[in-house]
Amino acid sequence: MGKEKFSRSKPHVNVGTIGHVDHGKTTLTAAITSVLAAKFGGTAKAYDQIDAAPEEKARGITINTAHVEYETANRHYAHVDCPGHADYVKNMITGAAQMDGAILVVSAADGPMPQTREHILLARQVGVPYIIVFLNKCDMVDDAELLELVEMEVRELLDKYEFPGDTTPIIHGSAKLAMEGDKGPMGEQAIMKLADALDSYIPLPERAIDGAFLMPVEDVFSISGRGTVVTGRVERGIIKVGEEIEIVGIHDTQKTTCTGVEMFRKLLDQGQAGDNVGILLRGTKREDVQRGQVLCKPGSIKPHTHFTGEIYVLSKDEGGRHTPFFNNYRPQFYFRTTDVTGAIELPEGKEMVMPGDNVSIIVKLINPIAMEEGLRFAIREGGKTVGAGVVAKIIA
């Protein structure tokens, strides 16, 4: 079956929905696709098409994020809808890592809830640079003062996690009304306002297209008759069909060749920074590649286990630990797409670290990870995020 080529006529931006469960993330995602498809062309996606995606079996393997695409007058957007439940945090992290900006959905009827806070914190942690707020279900709130109060609460929460609360666009509307074809200010007009905010508030990302090719592995599929396909978002550089690449991290570094690139099921000659792609690898077995590794230009990045980091430990109120930790504490370090256990060495004279502290640490991981200074990570314990950090200096 011949695949159509993917058009690059408009600049491409990655966004996604975040926020508390049942505040309307998926309904809003569906509303955006239907309103913008009617106006600028594209495909409307129904709620259940998007909602099914978190548990979707694609070629027999579960993918945990729904990807949709839509266009505004000026741009092409790829949009991920992250599942909202707390136990999906790992997927939220991988989803949020693919965003040039996030749409935070807050129910006007409920106001900010625990996952609202958690998702803003995660956005801060995984380096989502911009947040736009969609205050949903405004049709259910008659009191204008109450709406103002909720908006104020959201702005304060954004400030707390170092997003510019005062200048963040907050759009009032109802995703449900928009889905039902309501042409009023709460319906389609609110979606168009949101589209304008996406275009004007989220700057075109400075793509690291000139860097050495790097793509964190998110998923691996075996496709009969074609070989092994690795999916992920190209972090930087360009990958062309026929180029040699390395698989780095966890195991010994392996060399392979890219024999195909596809995006939204369309074939490309190349994948470039910012693209969500599938890369076909020659002669690589399904079991030779796993989440947590990276594909990269040969020699451009090395695997490491030993580094110093600057970390912030979440307070109890932020959902972090209730007790301090001590030297040789062994949590999981979440790099890009996976958890790796590591031991923490505290600075001399520092006996313990309290929730809410920030501290310089030395870390030794049990498996090597493709690493550079400036790489961000989360610290997790039993599936719960307890800290955030950045690689300050590589030791070995």
Curated annotation (Swiss-Prot):
Region annotation (G3) ranges: 81-84
Subcellular location: Cytoplasm
Major localization listed first in the record, in broad terms: cytoplasm
Residue segments, region G1: 19-26
Molecular function terms, GO-annotated: GTP binding; GTPase activity; guanosine tetraphosphate binding; translation elongation factor activity
Key word Aminoacyl-tRNA synthetase present: no
G4, as annotated region: 136-139
Amino-acid positions noted as binding Mg(2+) in the UniProt annotation, renumbered to this chain: T26
Presence of the UniProt keyword Nucleotide-binding in the record: yes
Gene Ontology annotations for the cellular component aspect, listed alphabetically: cytosol
Function: GTP hydrolase that promotes the GTP-dependent binding of aminoacyl-tRNA to the A-site of ribosomes during protein biosynthesis.
Family: Belongs to the TRAFAC class translation factor GTPase superfamily. Classic translation factor GTPase family. EF-Tu/EF-1A subfamily.
This protein's name: Elongation factor Tu 1
Source species: Albidiferax ferrireducens (strain ATCC BAA-621 / DSM 15236 / T118) (Rhodoferax ferrireducens)
Biological classification of the source: Bacteria, Pseudomonadati, Pseudomonadota, Betaproteobacteria, Burkholderiales
